[in-house]
Amino acid sequence: MIKQFHGAEKVNLKTQNLKKEVVRIFKKHGLSTDHAIISANALINAELVGAYGHGLSRLKMYCDRISKKVINPKPKIKVKKISQSISHIDANDSIGFVAADIAIKKAISNAKKTGIGLVAVKNSGHYGLSGYYAEQAVKKNLVTMIYTNAPPAIKDKLQKHRTVQLMSTSIDITDGS
């Protein structure tokens, strides 16, 4: 159950009811059922671990980006095998959760076969909490490093344009149990 305060009003929602509602909203904006479920799971996980800035507070942003055609709700995602260990994904402007889900599953599969799994993703959007994906690999007893980039967001007082990127990094290590 998610318990969170919003102003003076306390909101209690059962996670399954919340998931159904988030899936419904994503489907209303054109995502397939599978993509809506993947996206809802990632957003709700962020809420459950207390990373509210990567959770439901971003739902409207994703829906707006779909409406403005920044996110492609019906992407044709291509996975290219580079080697036994390395894959490349062209996410076709998909919602980032779906691209990240495919990427971590491919990385886990490659790592289980060869000892290492590297996956690069292009043409994808914001994918939420990096640790959500890293944790999936750690549960399979794999060391995980996830990196992403972002558009320039910070500028120095003397600069005219933003030049510093804010980059997310997640490194997770299993204890072997």
Q: For the regions a protein language model found, what residue spans apply to each?
A:
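Generic N-terminal amphipathic, Lys/Arg-enriched alpha-helix
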Residues: I2-H29
